[in-house]
Amino acid sequence: MNTLLAQEIHDKALACGYDDCGIVPLDALDFYKERMIKRLEDVPESKKVYAHSNAFLTLKENYPWAQSIVVCTEYFGAYKFPASLQKRYAKGLLLSLANIPDGVEVKQRRSFETWFNDKNIQFIGGETAKPTGVVPLRPASVAAGLGIYRKNNFFYGPKGSNYELVAYLIDKSCEYIHDTDIPPCPDSCN
C-alpha cells in the first residue's frame, strides 16, 4: 500500500478544487456487492430497478487492472432549486455544474485527470451528473470515510447532503480513509 501516493492524490484533488478526497481498495466495496445480491434475491421484482447497477457487481472482472477507488466530494452549498423542480428527483443530476463544458468545474476535473496521466496512473471514471458511472458513488464515499448514510439513504458529509460525488478506479494500490464524526440522523428525523 503506497501511503505517499495516497497523500499526493488527496492533495492534488484538493488543489483541483475538490472539497475532500478519500481512497479505498477495490475490496472495500465487497459489502455493497453482497447487499445488492441479497436485495435482488429477496425482492426479485427489483431487478429492473437495479439493472443499471449490474456493472457495479463485476468491477473486478470488468477492470482486472483496478486496485483502488479514488472518491472526491464537491460541496455545492445550500443551493435552492427553482419551484418548478421542487419534489422532483435528479435535480442535481440535471443542473450539475459539471454539465457546463467550459465551466470551472470541468476544467478542474480535467486537470486532476491530466495529473493522473502525468503520474502514469491508469484510471477510469470521473463521471458525475450521469445516471450511472463506473463506481457506485455513495457506497464508495462512505467506505472512504467522507460521509455517512442517514435514514433517507442519502449521503451526508460534514456540511449536509448537498455534495457532488466523483470517483475513479485506479491501477495503484493505496488508501486514504478519513475518520468521520458525523452524527447519525436523530430519532426525530424522517
Regions found by a protein language model. Give the residues of each.
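Auxiliary alpha/beta "docking" domains used to position bulky ligands
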Residues: 1-187
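Active-site recognition of the HExxH zinc-binding catalytic motif
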Residues: 190
